Amino acid sequence: MHIKLVIFAILLPSSLLLLLMGTTNFQQGYVEAQTNSTQVFTSPNHTFSLNYPLDWEIAPRNSTFPYYGETTALVLRPIMNETVTPLNEIFFSISVSDVKRLLEDNKSLPAEFLDKLVADKISSFEDPSSIYGNLNVKLLGNNYTRLGDHPAKELTFLTQNLGTFEVDTYTIYNDQLYHVNFMGPQSKVSQLYEEFQQIKDSFRFLS
């Protein structure tokens, strides 16, 4: 599982590369053993699947930590032997939203929609009225990538006043906006970024 970070050198911006170097009973889906090190999650409507490590778990919906929103389809987190707090929380989430009407109203192609979505988020980093406005956000990467063999956009940034590292990946598939989010303490990035990439790379659309 510990793949040398040099593998990612040609794929990551230099600032990010330097940073890297320095509930089984889930009612809305199911998991099954796949190998000795991962298990499979398939969404309840069989629209996507992914693999995640055995030392991760599906976050419970009744948790005191606000993992789930209206559009959240899945949240994964490492199994921890300590109390979870906003300062040590690590998670990988997938949210799905219907954007068919927005695409039609704006007469936008999916790629154009994603470009604007990402541009607006970057602008919010400097907007005092936004949730990021006073958090001293440092942008590490704004790149094209793929999610489930589908074109995607990816933002990587530090929220320096909170000490968190975050990756947002967006793609549109069948008029649905898929948002993959990874968040964790900046101090643990080098330990967990590879696992995040492995989970993301295993993502597949099923229908």
Task: Annotate each language-model stretch with its function.
Residues 1-10:
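N-terminal Sec-pathway targeting helices
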Residues 9-19:
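Hydrophobic membrane-insertion alpha-helices, especially the h-region
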Residues 19-35:
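Sec-dependent signal peptide cleavage junction
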Residues 31-75:
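N-terminal "mature-domain start" segment
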Residues 47, 108, 112, 186, ...:
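Soluble non-cytosolic domains of exported or imported proteins
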Residues 53, 115-122, 193-200:
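Extracytoplasmic/secreted envelope proteins and their assembly/folding machinery
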Residues 56-58, 176-207:
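Surface-exposed amphipathic alpha-helical segments
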Residues 62-172, 178:
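Conserved polar/disulfide-associated segments of primarily extracytoplasmic proteins
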